């Protein structure tokens, strides 16, 4: 939770730290690229403070792009400090999915060109939390705890498949 990432070389005689990066003051999520041909080439970390995510070189953790998550909620209200909750790497496309907690937006981050970064935001439900993939690795399911909903993203089509009311405080694990 201290927003410090460590890259450890497990192939060394004695595994050791080979790179370190501090991406903020407090963080919850880190992920690496999973799409075929891009495996572990890009790393991403999302922070609670400052409200941002950082894209890094997967071999060195050298920062390549920092993106602030400040913006509008799904209710069209400005939120100055939306924290980054879950981050997952798509298996369908070279993209990360980033939950901006308080805004209720799921960012789809295309990492093929970090200089000209392509971002798409999907409206889900406020207070996004944790999530994961279904068994096909096509659908990302994520809980919106305080909204009592589960959002489902079709990562093959890059669109919201459903936002499902589920009762009280869904929590994936």
Positions of the model-derived regions?
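Predominantly soluble domains enriched in secretory-pathway, periplasmic, or organellar proteins
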Residues: 1-173
């Amino acid at each position: 939770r201290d927003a410090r990432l460590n890259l450890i070389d497990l192939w060394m005689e004695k595994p050791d730290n080979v790179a370190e990066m501090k991406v903020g003051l407090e963080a919850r999520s880190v992920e690496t690229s999973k799409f075929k041909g891009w495996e572990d080439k890009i790393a991403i970390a999302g922070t609670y403070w400052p409200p941002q995510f950082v894209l890094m070189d997967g071999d060195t953790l050298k920062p390549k792009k920092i993106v602030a998550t400040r913006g509008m909620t799904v209710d069209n209200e400005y939120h100055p400090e939306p924290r980054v909750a879950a981050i997952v790497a798509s298996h369908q496309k070279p993209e990360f999915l980033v939950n901006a907690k308080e805004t209720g937006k799921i960012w789809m981050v295309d990492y093929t060109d970090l200089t000209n970064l392509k971002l798409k935001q999907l409206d889900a439900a406020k207070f996004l939390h944790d999530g994961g993939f279904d068994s096909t690795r096509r659908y990302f399911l994520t809980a919106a705890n305080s909204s009592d909903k589960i959002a489902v993203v079709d990562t093959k089509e890059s669109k919201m498949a459903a936002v499902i009311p589920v009762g009280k405080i869904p929590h994936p694990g």
